[in-house]
C-alpha cells in the first residue's frame, strides 16, 4: 500500500479510534456475545447474531485503521514551502466558466471534510492542483463535466479541525 499523508492531528485521531476499538469496543462485544450465547438456541438468537455482526464490523475497522497507521506519513504542512500547491496548502481558485471563487485546503483522506473546504490529496480536484503555481490555469474534471480554473493564491494557514 502507498504511504498515506496526513497531519499529526489526523494521525492522532486514527490512533485514538484504534485504541478505543481495541481496548473498549472489542472487550465489550465479547461480553455481549457471551451474554447472548446464554439466551438459548444460537440459530434463532437475534441478539447473538447482532453481536457477532457488530464484532465483524469492529474487527474489520481495526484491520483498516491498523493499515492506515502502518502506512501513515505524518507531514507538518507549516514546514513546507507553499509556492506550489502541496499537502497542507490552502488554494483560492477561480472557476473561469462562471467567475465563482472557491477556497480549498489539501489534507489527508482521513481528515477531509469537503463541506468545510478540506479536500483529500487523492481527490480529483487536489490531484489536478498539486504541483501547480499561482496564476496557472487548470482543467478539472468535475461530476458535471470539465471546468477551467485559475489559481489565484496559494498559502499556508493553520487548519482548525473541528470535531463537531
From Swiss-Prot:
Single Gene Ontology BP term? regulation of DNA-templated transcription elongation
Going by the entry's taxonomy, the superkingdom of the source organism is recorded as Bacteria
Q: What are the protein's GO molecular function terms?
A: DNA binding; RNA polymerase binding
Stored Pfam families: GreA_GreB (PF01272), GreA_GreB_N (PF03449)
Which UniProt key words apply to this protein? DNA-binding, Transcription, Transcription regulation
Record-linked InterPro entries: GreA/GreB_C_sf, TF_GreA/GreB_CS, Tscrpt_elong_fac_GreA, Tscrpt_elong_fac_GreA/B, Tscrpt_elong_fac_GreA/B_C, Tscrpt_elong_fac_GreA/B_fam, Tscrpt_elong_fac_GreA/B_N, Tscrpt_elong_fac_GreA/B_N_sf
Q: What's the family?
A: Belongs to the GreA/GreB family.
Question: What is its biological role?
Answer: Necessary for efficient RNA polymerase transcription elongation past template-encoded arresting sites. The arresting sites in DNA have the property of trapping a certain fraction of elongating RNA polymerases that pass through, resulting in locked ternary complexes. Cleavage of the nascent transcript by cleavage factors such as GreA or GreB allows the resumption of elongation from the new 3'terminus. GreA releases sequences of 2 to 3 nucleotides.
Q: What is this protein called?
A: Transcription elongation factor GreA
Organism name: Helicobacter pylori (strain ATCC 700392 / 26695) (Campylobacter pylori)
Amino acid at each position: 500500500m502507498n504511504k498515506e499523508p496526513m497531519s499529526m492531528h489526523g494521525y492522532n485521531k486514527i490512533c485514538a479510534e484504534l485504541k478505543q476499538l481495541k481496548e473498549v469496543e472489542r472487550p465489550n462485544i465479547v461480553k455481549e456475545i457471551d451474554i447472548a450465547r446464554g439466551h438459548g438456541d444460537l440459530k434463532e438468537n437475534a441478539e447473538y447474531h447482532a453481536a457477532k455482526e457488530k464484532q465483524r464490523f469492529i474487527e474489520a475497522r481495526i484491520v483498516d485503521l491498523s493499515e492506515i497507521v502502518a502506512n501513515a506519513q505524518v507531514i507538518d504542512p507549516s514546514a513546507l514551502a507553499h509556492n506550489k500547491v502541496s499537502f497542507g496548502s490552502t488554494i483560492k481558485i477561480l472557476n473561469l466558466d462562471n467567475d465563482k471563487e472557491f477556497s480549498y485546503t489539501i489534507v489527508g483522506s482521513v481528515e477531509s471534510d469537503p463541506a468545510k473546504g478540506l479536500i483529500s490529496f487523492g481527490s480529483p480536484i487536489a490531484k489536478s492542483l498539486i504541483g501547480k503555481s499561482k496564476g496557472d490555469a487548470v482543467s478539472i474534471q468535475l461530476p458535471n463535466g470539465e471546468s477551467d480554473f485559475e489559481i489565484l493564491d496559494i498559502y499556508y494557514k493553520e487548519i482548525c479541525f473541528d470535531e463537531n
